[in-house]
């Protein structure tokens, strides 16, 4: 007499009861697939946790002087590593220097002309 399981669960037959080799092969394939899915899910969750932890970490705020030095030497993400500046960046920096020096010379001559017109300086 068979014992009834609670909640109307049926008694499961064991895989060893089947003699068909194809069923055993299908079972192995299914087991391999589920293991592969589990390992992929673990990797995905680890990657997600890693990205979330990196996103949560606050990056240290650099002082203004350090940011200017990093810009000058072409250091983008590596703070302590000096990288050779590329040609485009060299041209941009050169043009910035020309612009700043031109502005300073213009301001100097502008103030000079203003003082000459006011009569403080003599020509």
Curated annotation (Swiss-Prot):
Listed Basic and acidic residues bias regions: 31-57
Keyword terms, alphabetized: Membrane, Transmembrane, Transmembrane helix
Main location: membrane
A molecular function (GO) term: protein transmembrane transporter activity
Residue stretches spanning the membrane: 91-111
Domain of life: Bacteria
Record's subcellular location: Membrane
Keyword Transmembrane in annotation: yes
Membrane topology, record value: Single-pass membrane protein
GO annotations of cellular component type: membrane
GO BP terms in the entry: protein secretion
Stretches for region Disordered: 31-58
InterPro entries given in the database record: SecE_bac
The name this protein goes by in its record: Uncharacterized protein MG055
Gene source species: Mycoplasma genitalium (strain ATCC 33530 / DSM 19775 / NCTC 10195 / G37) (Mycoplasmoides genitalium)
